[in-house]
From Swiss-Prot, chains A, B, C:
Region described as Disordered: 426-516
Keywords attached to this entry: Ammonia transport, Cell membrane, Membrane, Transmembrane, Transmembrane helix, Transport
Biased composition regions of type Basic and acidic residues, renumbered to the chain: 445-491
Similarity comment: Belongs to the ammonia transporter channel (TC 1.A.11.2) family.
TM helices/strands, residue ranges: 17-37, 59-79, 101-121, 130-150, 170-190, 214-234, 258-278, 286-306, 307-327, 342-362, 374-394
Higher taxonomy: Archaea, Methanobacteriati, Methanobacteriota, Stenosarchaea group, Halobacteria
Induction of the gene: Highly expressed during ammonium starvation under nitrate-rich conditions.
Subunit structure, as described in the record: Homotrimer. Interacts with both GlnK1 and GlnK2 after ammonium shock. Interaction is rapid, reversible and dependent on nitrogen source.
Pfam families to which the protein is assigned, alphabetical: Ammonium_transp
Gene Ontology MF terms: ammonium channel activity
Protein known as: Ammonium transporter Amt1
BP term (GO), one: ammonium homeostasis
InterPro entries: Ammonium/urea_transptr, NH4_transpt_AmtB-like_dom
Species the sequence originates in: Haloferax mediterranei (strain ATCC 33500 / DSM 1411 / JCM 8866 / NBRC 14739 / NCIMB 2177 / R-4) (Halobacterium mediterranei)
Primary gene name: amt1
Length: 516, 516, 516
């Protein structure tokens, strides 16, 4: 056996980077998780807009974060610590293929912060304004927070405040750096764009607008939990560490603590939210259990390597327990229409869980650390509020933050994108179909209630109760109870009242409509 | 180059634990797989209840398995083998962060057994009774099975029976320890809770109640198959083994056999079920092909490292071929309404595949092994039947196993959780809406057929054909063909018969109803 | 510390094969990605058929590829290169468990090519004909392409053409070997089976038939992107390479380049398609952004380790930009009804991205390489066209390529499989329900517009507007506006016009129908 003439660092690199690549892919997979969580909580007529915003967060975000964002974080780290900075060095990663795995690992965290925001402003924000914000949060707002913390800036042990206090800010995987940043930015956006039409009654009372598919929201939640194992446990990026003596050390205990506390926090958050929603609403609510599971995860995300297992369980339970009350406060007191409750789930749970790390720390309580935690939460929140408000205001000035009332009623899918996501179930269908006119060629059954005119060429059956005019060329069955006029050119002898007496198997229409 | 002064164990730990962590995350991802598989096979009015039960299995299950379950398994292992046991040692993992990755790896298997059960008892079991069972199967019923087998107890080589026979029970990744345990417990629950209303005709003939989305069921199946690669191949947890001579050995052949037999078993199971369902129903059925794919996976899960590749192909095909006949036997002979066929997919395929391991063993046939396999299947099944019956009976006594007939008809989403999962497509919507009264504020189009009264404030269009009374304050369009009374307070001059002649674009209502 | 007496190859094997196994699982997960992408783009009445074809691609495909396909590739490699071949050696993997992980790694690429085809021929191809093609592409058509390229054949550096030109064909992860092969085969199939009824108007103008769920299509896209990280980065299968000096080298730069170019290509493709679709249709279209994301990925899949990061960005953007124009050309000029645009996404983007590798090569431009790239694209496309045409023609001769017009109108779910995927939303339900007669026993709300007769025993509410006759035995509410006859045997006193005045809460039926 040839004595192994290898550098232990190489072995460690091999193991560590297989781990880092796989967890980066898992964290990317949180993008469809967030898209489903949000799509499920909006009405069918706005699902396409949600999908568009979530794809844009990622597609545009990675380009911006590569060309600008990652460099800005390093510069801010240097600016807010004695270390100083060098612009060329800050952007050196762009030409260094050896740095590109680390860049991807950083990018998937940045994109997570960005995609949280869309959940708060859904169903009424202008798509162009949103794109401006998505580019800015990935190019500037989030990178500043990353600079202040993970890139050695102000709040880190080597930053001005960290050096002054003698302790660095603890937020292991981004409960505040990523989630609170996204949650607070979302709250600011929801406030500035205003509530959806009908969300609050005349006297300001909350009138919930249920999403079109709780199934999608819970599926999104469980996909997020799957990706979150990459988010939390993956941030323990060192599996094999090289020791001073030239050997290797397996970081099993650290990995184990992060994996366990993530699991217990998730479980406790979901169970706590089940209990609290039963208390609030009389019955355990699946959507609140899902939000509790997420809030439990957010609450422990900053704490996972730092706290005891029972501390993680308590923090998770706390996150899950406060998510519904925090949402109610957002809606009933602040009167802010945060559609997916992102402030409650990501903002409040992230802040509370990260501030309380010292209370449950494995190494015991430290008042200084508590001071730093509270200061860190405050500084990140303040920066995010100010920066988001400025960017939303600017985007609003250029494009207008909100779509028109008419478009909001019709749905952003048609208004912003000219599409219907579920043409056979609800609403208009297909880009060729202008508003009001609908050339259904899909053989699907139409239940029309919008007065639009149908041009049917696909044998699909129509139940018309809205006075719209049909042009039938396909022998499909028409049932008219609405006085609408039928124009049939499919060989049917059109009797009175829209009854096609020959080919099509039409029932009597009792609507007195004229048919040619 | 510094000669590597490292302990080969450390290198092996690094490689092996990256593998164990990633496969644990994959096995967790089977939770949404099971949730979709079940949600797709129930009616829309019960999907929220399915999601709630699946989230509870995991969230509550991990807490119970950490505090109780894992320790119980070790104790049972000691109790049923000459080894004896020590309670403190059995629960020592709780305080040992070095043991927490292994705990998570065990927990994801336990949670898989628990979540299978809900598929059998869907659409009529009381949620509180179910929660009791979920806690007990993760805290006691499954851990006993784990103790008897994987934790060195009765059936293992070191257990009383194993020592007596001179062979240990073979079930590599849990075809019976996990899947048959879940499938049998599900059958017991389905039997004790009774069939769904309308499932059997007056003369006991089967009247299938189709699920609301075969797409979700097949998507769940393919997510399960993705996680199953972690379930099976991950159970070959040692990638690099340390040899006696202090070197390392790559377990490529063992990993390769498990990966190949898993793939061929899956494929053969699906193809066999396609052929059998064509034979049974005249046409190849996608849902039975999906169930065959799962049954093929279950059938090889215990066998994967032990059998030849063609043996795995045969076992998989056998699993896929018997799943439909086993389901028909469950329904037509046992008259048990096992909604998702969990007994056929997980119970029967698991038992048959694991019992027949010796027939296809790489090392050749062993009668003693066959005796142990059959004994093992019998003991695990018997324990599961008795324990499940006792727990279901106890839960039934405290809470009643079954929801009321009225609630079953209305749907468990509203009855147990006060929600509707697809408000724009079917049924009630939102927690504020008591049964019968519906304050639709979502702008969605309502097709009301339940006589409930509508309070509309969101401009959504109503097609009322059920005599319910509308209170409209939003200019939305009403089409009344049912004599229902409209109360319009949105500036519309309410003409006779519910025609709002000004703002709202209402068509003539020909229903003679009174409108104020 | 014992000096490590290990073979560096073993350490490298451990690390590399954990990586290869995990990425193989990720690539398998692209199967449900493709299934959702396709299911979302067809009508509800054909979703079951899409699911069936996608499950069959995988289940049958892995069996065929194990028994035949992988061996054929090796033989073709030997046949088209000076190396020659040996049949026994070509199929030696079948008995060698040490080769089975590599086999699985190859199989998941083969299955990807197969499943792309079904997206083009959806909604009208006979299922048996499709199964014949699925078996042939996995057993012969794709393996020949693999042989010509990755298995050392004609186009590789050691192949006849490669040796002649002095350069081997570059297609790192299969932009053309897998994707263009699938896309071209799909185009041939779509051409030979003919367009869907109603897809083109009388004068040949395009009449889009929108899919039933853009949400599923975008979810499928993002699942594909998740698996694609395994597809591209996983093809850099060596994480730790053993050096000549007996040491190990970490391939970080190679892995980093593939990971970065994959990410930038994906992002640029999506953003480019968003811009182009806005230009074409006036508004940014979510489905085209999703297709652009995929086309961006395809375009860089062959190029990822070979090109600069900005080259990857340009290739991705190019792929995303040409996908809509390529689709329009397919439809408007070629008049081919490629339902999911697989030729545009996988064929055109794959060809263009791979042909242009030399233009953006890290090592600089090479005219010879460009010649090889163009020749390779041409040879693969030509082989695929000829072979696919022959197989589709043969399958058509035996089974007929196309389902009947009546079946196409009714939907392939019922015609080919006897099922309805969304019974509560649209269409017939359950295998027991022959066409026209429907024994709804699911308590679901029926909106019947097809004149079929209902036998209701489950309390579900009916809105009948189609003259069909109801037999009610369950107290469910009936609303009749269609003159249909009600036969009520549930204790209701059936008044005139179908009004059950006692138990069932029926509204007045104004249809003059006779009720007993």
């Amino acid at each position: 056996m040839i004595p192994l003439q290898v550098d232990p660092n190489v072995v460690a690199q091999g193991v560590n980077y297989v781990w880092i690549l796989v967890v980066s892919f898992l964290i990317f997979f949180m993008q469809p998780g967030f898209a489903l969580l949000e799509a499920g909580q909006v009405r069918a007529k706005n699902v396409g807009n949600v999908l568009m915003k979530n794809m844009t967060d990622w597609a545009l975000g990675v380009l911006v974060y590569f060309v600008v964002g990652a460099g800005v974080a390093t510069i801010v780290g240097g600016l807010t610590s004695p270390g100083g900075f060098d612009v060329a060095a800050a952007f050196s990663y762009i030409g260094d293929s050896g740095a590109w795995i680390d860049w991807l690992f950083g990018a998937v965290f940045a994109m997570t912060a960005a995609t949280i925001v869309s959940g708060a402003v859904a169903e009424r924000m202008d798509f162009r304004a949103y794109v401006v914000f998505a580019a800015t949060i990935t190019g500037f707002i989030y990178p500043v927070v990353q600079g202040l913390t993970w890139s050695g800036g102000l709040l880190s042990g080597s930053g001005y405040l960290g050096a002054a206090l003698g302790v660095g800010y603890l937020d292991f995987a981004g409960a505040t750096v990523v989630h609170m940043c996204g949650g607070v930015a979302g709250l600011v956006g929801a406030k500035m764009v205003g509530p959806r039409k009908g969300r609050f009654g005349a006297s300001g009372e909350s009138q919930p607008i249920p999403g079109h598919s709780m199934l999608l929201a819970v599926l999104g939640t469980l996909i997020l939990a799957f990706g979150w194992y990459g988010f939390n446990v993956g941030t323990q990026a060192t599996v094999l560490a090289t020791t001073e003596s030239g050997g290797l050390e397996f970081m099993g205990a650290a990995l184990g603590r992060v994996a366990l506390v993530t699991t217990l926090g998730m479980g406790a958050g979901a169970v706590a939210a089940m209990v609290v929603s039963t208390n609030y609403q009389g019955k355990p609510d699946p959507l609140w259990m899902a939000n509790g599971l997420l809030a439990g995860l957010v609450a422990v995300t900053g704490a996972v390597p730092h706290v005891t297992w029972w501390g993680g369980l308590v923090l998770g339970a706390l996150g899950g327990a406060i998510v519904l009350p925090a949402y109610r406060w957002t809606v009933d007191s602040l009167k802010i229409d945060d559609v997916c409750g992102v402030f409650a789930v990501h903002g409040v749970a992230g802040a509370v869980g990260t501030a309380l790390i010292p209370v449950f720390a494995v190494g015991g309580f430290s008042a200084t650390q508590l001071v730093m935690q509270v200061a860190g939460v405050g500084i990140i929140a303040l920066w995010t509020i100010v920066a988001s408000a400025v960017v939303f205001a600017a985007a609003g000035t250029v494009f207008g933050l909100r779509v028109s009332e008419e478009e909001e009623l019709e749905g952003l899918d048609i208004g912003e994108h000219g599409v219907s996501v579920y043409p056979e179930f609800i609403g208009e269908s297909g880009p060729d179909r202008g508003v009001g006119t609908r050339a259904a060629t899909d053989g699907g059954n139409d239940v029309r209630t919008d007065g639009g005119n149908d041009v049917r060429t696909d044998g699909g059956n129509d139940v018309r109760t809205d006075g719209g005019n049909d042009v039938r060329t396909d022998g499909g069955n028409d049932v008219r109870t609405d006085g609408g006029n039928d124009v049939r050119t499919d060989g049917d002898v059109v009797g009175d009242n829209g009854v096609a007496v020959t080919e099509g198997n039409d029932s009597a229409a009792v609507d007195g409509g004229e048919n040619q």
